[in-house]
């Protein structure tokens, strides 16, 4: 089934050229089924690039998905046309009263910035709290995992001495976890972060279930027991050339970045990298949509908040 997006969104043309099943709003109104409503809080600088990457992941599912885009920083963007933001993005006040089957909060280039110094940190905390009553399941990516661990569990950020960048091997820890259904026992995924996610610390300070880990990159995939918060510390949505773009950008800025590990053929940045994580990336998003969103959400989207209020107030809990 397709992902439903606005008719003029740039991602529609790009994904169509890639033979990915998308449905414009004008066509979707003829469909007589309820699509899943997913809110994407896009914190990445290159918003159009991130939109395309995430919508590519969401489209590979038998479920129809209706996407809303959210921004919380109203400062002028250096990487995204203002007209694009005005045409396709909502601010939080516009969606505050809505319910969503799923929400994705992206990463952000803020790994070395203290939370309190992030201009929109109070709003991030507010949205995470808001999601408890308005979203069935939230997927946090990379920096958003750090933010959620702080907001939900009071965990302070841990950082690496140098940026963790490259494609790392992970092993699954649970053979029966639906999020990993169809995964190989070992799989690779890209990372691009200063954040450190130590399994022992996360186990000591949270009640999260850890489903996949890496000897080099730490925890990769975890979730709350009720499936309502999912934490992915890497970037399974990345294109084959995204890490290369980041490396070349940092190189041009004189930052002397480390070469992303296990990424370039023969570790040679002049050679074109290929994506080795694409199938598992698609599978992760598909499993999340199916098992953590579709299977758990309310039949009527307007009932989502009522269901979770009832569950929280139930004497059996």
Curated annotation (Swiss-Prot):
GO terms (BP aspect): L-methionine biosynthetic process from homoserine via O-succinyl-L-homoserine and cystathionine
EC number: 2.3.1.46
EC primary class: transferase
Residue numbers binding substrate: 163, 192, 249
Site (Important for substrate specificity): 192
Record keywords: Acyltransferase, Amino-acid biosynthesis, Cytoplasm, Methionine biosynthesis, Transferase
Pfam family, one: HTS
UniProt-listed CDD domains: GATase1_HTS
Record PANTHER family: HOMOSERINE O-SUCCINYLTRANSFERASE
Alphabetized NCBIfam families for the sequence: metA (TIGR01001)
Stated role: Transfers a succinyl group from succinyl-CoA to L-homoserine, forming succinyl-L-homoserine.
Record's protein name: Homoserine O-succinyltransferase
Organism lineage string: Bacteria, Pseudomonadati, Pseudomonadota, Gammaproteobacteria, Aeromonadales
């Amino acid at each position: 089934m397709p992902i439903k997006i606005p008719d003029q969104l740039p991602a529609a043309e790009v994904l169509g050229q890639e033979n990915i099943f998308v449905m414009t709003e004008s066509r979707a109104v003829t469909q007589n089924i309820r699509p899943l409503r997913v809110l994407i809080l896009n914190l990445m600088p290159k918003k159009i690039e991130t939109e395309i990457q995430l919508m590519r992941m969401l489209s590979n599912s038998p479920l129809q998905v209706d996407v809303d885009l959210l921004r919380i920083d109203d400062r002028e963007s250096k990487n995204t046309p203002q007209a694009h933001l005005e045409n396709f993005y909502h601010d939080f006040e516009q969606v505050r009263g809505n319910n969503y089957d799923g929400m994705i909060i992206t990463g952000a280039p803020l790994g070395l910035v203290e939370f309190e110094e992030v201009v929109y940190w109070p709003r991030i905390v507010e949205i995470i709290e808001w999601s408890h009553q308005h979203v069935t399941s939230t997927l946090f990516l990379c920096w958003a995992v750090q933010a959620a661990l702080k907001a939900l569990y009071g965990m302070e950020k841990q950082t690496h001495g140098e940026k963790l960048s490259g494609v790392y091997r992970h092993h699954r820890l649970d053979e029966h976890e639906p999020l990993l259904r169809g995964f190989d026992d070992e799989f690779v995924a890209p990372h691009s972060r200063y954040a450190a996610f130590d399994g022992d610390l996360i186990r000591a300070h949270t009640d999260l279930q850890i489903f996949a880990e890496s000897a080099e990159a730490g925890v990769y995939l975890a979730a709350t027991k009720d499936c309502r918060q999912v934490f992915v510390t890497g970037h399974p949505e990345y294109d084959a050339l995204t890490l290369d773009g980041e490396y070349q950008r940092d190189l041009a800025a004189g930052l002397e970045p480390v070469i992303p590990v296990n990424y370039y053929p023969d570790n040679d940045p002049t050679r074109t990298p290929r994506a080795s994580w694409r199938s598992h990336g698609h599978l992760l998003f598909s499993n999340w949509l199916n098992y953590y969103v579709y299977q758990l959400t309310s039949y009527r989207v307007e009932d989502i908040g009522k269901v979770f209020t009832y569950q929280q107030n139930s004497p059996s809990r």
